Amino acid sequence: MKIPIILTLMLFSLGFIFGFISINNLSKINDKDLSNYIPNIQFNFPSILTNNLKVIFLMLAGSITFGLSTFINLIFNGFNVGVLIGSISLTNEPLKLITALILPHGIFEISAMLISAVAGFKIPYKVTLYLLDKKEKPLTEEDIKDFLKLSLISIILIVIAAFIEVYITPKIATYLLT
């Protein structure tokens, strides 16, 4: 289990660093050009939950794409978080803005994303061990149970994150920023 965790943290961090660094180049694009690339996501519970569940299921799909979908989406989402944090740092807004707008739901959302990525890498990792003759069976009942537990935990966390993002984060932000 250690290798999937390390791989997950390294790829997310790599994406984050590239996103954070590249925000200086992205900030040179004028708002009109940038508006074509910003997705139109409505700010309500079903929309936020659906969008976040897509990310979780793409991470989990790594179990059947031999880690490819997890790999791509982990770097992409790390990049997005890096761009978000980098763009906030460019605005010279106080740290409490970052805390108010990201931290309440971000703790659950990023945890869910990372846990689902570990799950998405777990099965390909176990199959690889089998192919390298380091395991007797490609998948054991325990491997499948672990995958399902991680999947369920990530889904529960993403539901909590969406709820907090829609119903609690705005109230915390309003309180801290007034």
Swiss-Prot record:
Domain of life according to the entry: Archaea
Signal peptide: none
Membrane-spanning residues: 3-23, 56-76, 101-121, 150-170
Topology of the protein relative to the lipid bilayer: Multi-pass membrane protein
Transmembrane helix among keywords: yes
InterPro entries in the record: SpoIIM-like
UniProt keyword annotation of Membrane present: yes
Subcellular location: Cell membrane
Keywords of the record: Cell membrane, Membrane, Transmembrane, Transmembrane helix
Main location: membrane
GO annotation, cellular component aspect: plasma membrane
Family: To M.jannaschii MJ0706 and Synechocystis PCC 6803 slr1478.
PANTHER family recorded: SLR1478 PROTEIN
Record's protein name: Uncharacterized protein MJ0793
Source species: Methanocaldococcus jannaschii (strain ATCC 43067 / DSM 2661 / JAL-1 / JCM 10045 / NBRC 100440) (Methanococcus jannaschii)
Lineage: Archaea, Methanobacteriati, Methanobacteriota, Methanomada group, Methanococci
